[in-house]
Amino acid sequence: MSIDLTDKIFNDEDAAWKHFESVRWPDGPICPHCGVIDSADKIIGKTARHGLYRCHECVKQFTATIGTIYEGSHIPMHKWLLAAHLMCASKKGMSAHQLWRMLGFGSYRTAWFMCHRIREGMTPKNVGPIGGQNRVVEADETLIGGKKKNRAFAKKEPKKHTVLTLVDRDGDSHSFHIANVKAKTLRETIVKVASRKSYLATDALASYETLGREFAGHGSVDHSTDEYVRLGGFVHVNTAECRFSLMKRAVFGTHHSISEAHLPRYLVEWDFKWNTRKMTDGERATIALEGIEGKRLTYRQTNEAAHA
């Protein structure tokens, strides 16, 4: 069942912290300082912060946000949960401007940084290998547009960024921002993510010809001759192209422009939604919440990436 937006966890701070702690600590509070499980008292009082505990063993104080992307945040927990749910429930994504208006933050920058921290939580700890014996992995590349303000005066189109997507027809998808479509560049990513026991399906790009020999089988379709399927529909890259269609709708319909520096996190979000497409919005939001452990993202990191 999907989460009801009228649920108390989205408007009551105590309920929000209780939900967050139940996901973060299913077996009771864990002290991040000494590692002791379920041996802490909750500090209660008018001046006490929400979710504050004191460990019986090391006597240090802690909250469930330590060691997560929420650490150090002054944003109320119920707004974090609501923002994460809205991003997980929106098929084409949620822009920072929209989130800013809906949640009533003091600044757009706060909402923008919040979105990136939530995307960081969606990042898988391990990528691949996808595919395997008797499975088909599609590999295809596309161009995602940059910002119009960054284009040269004489150019009609903004700079495009190359994205490679690998998708197991019966499983997950992973997308990457790559420098070019040369054989060496493609190989560096594909052989790490896709099992070589897989059948590799691609388009007719010459860079795939040699690479295909490293897999159990390789077939391609030539779009320049209006060929989109072969071998009775077995060879195609339609699944990967479906992924690209969803990506571009998110760019044009929601975000309008995405900078090269932050593109990888948007790719993570789109892959996450594809890989959890059979889940309800509530289940997807819970998975995103579970993924925040052991991850940190500071505003300085995002700002430095934008100016790198």
Language model region names:
Residues M1-A308:
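Residue-level recognition of single "structural anchor" positions
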